[in-house]
Curated annotation (Swiss-Prot):
HAMAP family per record: Cas1
Protein keywords: Antiviral defense, DNA-binding, Endonuclease, Hydrolase, Magnesium, Manganese, Metal-binding, Nuclease
Disulfide cross-links: none
Protein name per Swiss-Prot or TrEMBL: CRISPR-associated protein Cas1 3
Pfam families linked: Cas_Cas1
Regions that span the bilayer: none
Organism, as annotated: Methanobrevibacter ruminantium (strain ATCC 35063 / DSM 1093 / JCM 13430 / OCM 146 / M1)
Function of the protein: CRISPR (clustered regularly interspaced short palindromic repeat), is an adaptive immune system that provides protection against mobile genetic elements (viruses, transposable elements and conjugative plasmids). CRISPR clusters contain spacers, sequences complementary to antecedent mobile elements, and target invading nucleic acids. CRISPR clusters are transcribed and processed into CRISPR RNA (crRNA). Acts as a dsDNA endonuclease. Involved in the integration of spacer DNA into the CRISPR cassette.
Gene: cas1-3
Source species, domain of life: Archaea
Upper classification of the organism: Archaea, Methanobacteriati, Methanobacteriota, Methanomada group, Methanobacteria
Amino acid sequence: MKILIEGYNKSIHKRDNQILIMEKEGELEKINIKKIDDITIIGKGSITFDALRLISENNVRLMSIDYFGKINYTLEYPSNENIFLRKQQYKTSENHKGLIIAREMIMSKMINQKSTIKTLNKNKKLENVKIFERNINEAIKQIGSLRFGERTDIEKSKMKMMGIEGSASVDYWLAVNELLPKEIGFFSRNNRHPNDITNASLNYAYAILASEVNKALVINGLDSYCGFLHFDRQKRTSLTFDLMEEFRQQLVDKVVFSLVNTKQISNDDLDKRNNSISLDVRKLIIGRVLDKVNSNINYEGENLSYAQIIDKQAKKIVNYLINGEKYTGFSLRW
């Protein structure tokens, strides 16, 4: 079970073997710790030492996200398992094998980008959007043609891939600009200081996705701070951002674009003083993203939820690192 605690003045307590969620003096919910897989906190509140201990001892992942989509902190139970896996991960992140998995992740992202704008343009049939789509298709071919070996310059190759990915993303967001209603005021992607509801909603929803991806990586014994594509930075969960690339369009972009196109969200839902999203819309976004995460599709011959697919992709990373099995990214043609 995933617990998501949103809003102000909420607190987390321990009562026997239960987690108790309270607001001011009132009890909102109590859940047996054995039923909880992870807890995501979005907002301001407090948690008792006893609750922290109970959460940690039962290996429940705890993550805090601010209203702008930034991960504040995570809590994980200390483990000395999977040392060999971690060593392989660190080694691979610094050689050509890491580039191979990064290439697959980028290619999957671009396939999903192409599929998303193709779906959005199905009825509109805008010619300039078709040009952007063709540009992304060329970028997919460029990425797919890259080959890496033991003598490959890691930094240069990574920069080249990110350059191709960056160009494809420019085309993707230009296409999105053409496809969304003009009155919504979306002109370009802004992940730092969004002043429109579309960008703010994307940032917020990506944070929810980050929580899901981070959970899958940790469960499978991987170090979320050691990535293959994104450069390692202090306090940045690089591998989380790597794997997120495969799921951004299907789990976040399509959800937010649908809310915009059906006028369920507008710029009136954005507080212009600090560019934060209203409480009702935050709850709406959380609900829609989690509904999508828990929805099922047919993937590689199995009927799986997106949450299960994220876990499956994390396991593919493990099998690539330990057994040398080929890694294939997640993408859909629609």
